[in-house]
């Protein structure tokens, strides 16, 4: 039986909030089988819970933000969510003492190290997957994202920025998902932004924690980070990272073929909602026999970094 996963022990880290620029403490705790992924705002009294749910994503302007019926929010969840998807963690309590998850270095890599440091433990309950059964597509102008059936998790993402530092040879990335592939090919890709946009946003009191330490920054001609890129196609890899995190808002690893063109948090969420709203388009599956599991999900719990 392919089993559910949680952490072996709790672990804590501090970082900076991307939007507030303030110190944020993040605590990750083990959870019982079938708990799912649950975010908590511990700075509020009483504590407010945000179970991972695509319908709770109500702001996708600059990040993926969960907002409850009372308007309480928790922002920038997508990179941590991507790390959970990458390692196949089903059940976890995520506590944060601020309205946002710390940005760390702008990638999912620090969260991977944190989760592996806590240790991953299999639980005595069958792991559920969402299997795509029918073709589903959403569009927004020339942007689009789609799912179709596939026995694995395959991703194909294309960006299109008219910028001299983003050549046509670094605008597409394709990958067959596995824990190892995510850790080595995707998790280290950092978020990015354009200097003119960042200056405007900071004048509006946003992205106050943004810097060259936690983002790739481009002016009109070049990349401003002294150390350059971690991959020549780091930007499109980060967009794939975002998509993996956004799609894991379902709370389950997905078996299907995902393809997107110029998609962002909003369209990723729209696709996930469209899939889940059509009961003919998907089903829950579990696997008693490891031989039946799609190759990308057979990986051992421990991942070598």
Swiss-Prot record:
Keywords: Hydrolase, Lipid A biosynthesis, Lipid biosynthesis, Lipid metabolism, Metal-binding, Zinc. The active site is at residue 265. GO terms for cellular component: membrane. The keyword Hydrolase applies. GO terms for biological process: lipid A biosynthetic process. Its cofactor is Zn(2+). Its EC number is 3.5.1.108. It catalyses: a UDP-3-O-[(3R)-3-hydroxyacyl]-N-acetyl-alpha-D-glucosamine + H2O = a UDP-3-O-[(3R)-3-hydroxyacyl]-alpha-D-glucosamine + acetate. InterPro entries: Ribosomal_Su5_D2-typ_SF, UDP-acyl_GlcNac_deAcase, UDP-acyl_GlcNac_deAcase_C, UDP-acyl_N-AcGlcN_deAcase_N. It is an enzyme of class 3 (hydrolase). Pathway: Glycolipid biosynthesis; lipid IV(A) biosynthesis; lipid IV(A) from (3R)-3-hydroxytetradecanoyl-[acyl-carrier-protein] and UDP-N-acetyl-alpha-D-glucosamine: step 2/6. Zn(2+) binds at residues 79, 238, 242. GO terms for molecular function: metal ion binding; UDP-3-O-acyl-N-acetylglucosamine deacetylase activity. Belongs to the LpxC family. Catalyzes the hydrolysis of UDP-3-O-myristoyl-N-acetylglucosamine to form UDP-3-O-myristoylglucosamine and acetate, the committed step in lipid A biosynthesis. HAMAP family: LpxC. This is UDP-3-O-acyl-N-acetylglucosamine deacetylase. It comes from Haemophilus influenzae (strain PittGG). The lineage of its organism: Bacteria, Pseudomonadati, Pseudomonadota, Gammaproteobacteria, Pasteurellales. The gene is lpxC.
């Amino acid at each position: 039986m392919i089993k559910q996963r949680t952490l072996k022990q709790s672990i804590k880290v501090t970082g900076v909030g991307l939007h507030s620029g303030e110190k944020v403490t993040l605590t990750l705790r083990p959870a019982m089988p079938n708990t799912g992924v649950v975010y908590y705002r511990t700075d509020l009294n009483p504590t407010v819970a945000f179970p991972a749910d695509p319908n709770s994503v109500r702001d996708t302007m600059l990040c993926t933000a969960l907002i409850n019926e009372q308007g309480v929010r928790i922002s920038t969840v997508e990179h941590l969510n991507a790390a959970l998807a990458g390692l196949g963690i089903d059940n976890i309590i995520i506590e944060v003492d601020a309205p946002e998850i710390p940005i760390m270095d702008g990638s999912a890599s620090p969260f991977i190290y944190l989760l592996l440091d806590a240790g991953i433990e299999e639980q005595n309950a069958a792991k559920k997957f969402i299997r795509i059964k029918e073709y589903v597509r959403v569009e927004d102008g020339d942007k689009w994202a789609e799912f179709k059936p596939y026995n694995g998790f395959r991703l194909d993402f294309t960006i299109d920025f008219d910028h001299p530092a983003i050549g046509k040879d670094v605008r597409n990335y394709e990958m067959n998902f596995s824990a190892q592939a995510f850790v080595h090919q995707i998790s280290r890709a950092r978020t990015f932004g354009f200097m003119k946009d960042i200056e405007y946003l900071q004048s509006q009191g946003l992205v106050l924690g943004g810097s060259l330490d936690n983002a790739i920054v481009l002016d009109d001609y070049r990349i401003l980070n002294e150390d350059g890129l971690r991959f020549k196609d780091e930007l499109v890899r980060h967009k794939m990272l975002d998509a993996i995190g956004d799609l894991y808002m379902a709370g389950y690893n997905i078996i299907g073929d995902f393809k997107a063109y110029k998609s962002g948090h909003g369209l990723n969420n729209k696709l996930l909602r469209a899939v889940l709203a059509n009961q003919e388009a998907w089903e829950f599956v579990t696997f008693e026999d490891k031989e039946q599991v799609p190759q990308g999900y057979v990986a051992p719990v421990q991942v070598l970094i």
